Amino acid sequence: MGLAKRIIPCLDVTNGRVVKGVKFVSLRDAGDPIEIARRYDDQGADELTFLDITASSDDRDLILHIIEEVAAQVFIPLTVGGGVRKVEDVRRLLNAGADKVSINTSAIQNPQLVADAAGRYGSQCIVVAIDAKRAGQGWEVFTHGGRKPTGLDAIEWAKKMQSLGAGEILLTSMDRDGTRDGFDLALTRAVSDAVDVPVIASGGVGNLQHLVDGVVEGHADAVLAASVFHYGEYTVRQAKEYMSQHGIEVRL
């Protein structure tokens, strides 16, 4: 059956706080990234993704501090993205305890960054994040949080990123993000089938069946979700049990 499929909660961090409606009832502090990371670790998450959505560069050291703290207490792989512009940024995040670094806008502005970072640290720790929107018969890559069109075809871009050394693709449907209507399965499948590296499906999860669909119909290797876990509607463990009942191999 191949490798177990992964469930990855995603935490958006700004100014040292997790945002996007984290409402864990029993948390003393609903915005504390370390406490939330520990909670997901306890629930059996396979990995965690932290996206630093802080616009200003003066807060960069804050995310490094958070990653150091989380890495000291949580022993599942951590992917960190947001504001990675040069190889030095990759180095600092890996040194702080990140296992993988996600590159998004900078990969488009400077594709060589992906090649340089993969060359220095290995493809296994370089993730390229692609935000895509439906455009005609295909999908177009957007940057700056889905606000800026690039004119790039998402499938071709994913193939190019793989060829430059990306070890994983984090694929978000901007059409579905936040809708809770499920992944864009056609997009997920098209990219998953076009590349050999793992694809993480993101954007649109509203229930546990959506996670199953992402793997079975979308051919994704991993599924990422935020609000369904943050709001406490489902635990990661419930999600894994549901996927397992539907014939998907997961790490229980």
Curated annotation (Swiss-Prot):
GO MF annotations in UniProt: imidazoleglycerol-phosphate synthase activity; lyase activity
Enzyme class: lyase
Keyword Transmembrane helix applies: no
Single Gene Ontology BP annotation: L-histidine biosynthetic process
Summary of the function given for this chain in its UniProt record: IGPS catalyzes the conversion of PRFAR and glutamine to IGP, AICAR and glutamate. The HisF subunit catalyzes the cyclization activity that produces IGP and AICAR from PRFAR using the ammonia provided by the HisH subunit.
NCBIfam families: hisF
Family: Belongs to the HisA/HisF family.
Descriptive protein name: Imidazole glycerol phosphate synthase subunit HisF
Record organism: Nitrosospira multiformis (strain ATCC 25196 / NCIMB 11849 / C 71)
Gene designation per UniProt: hisF
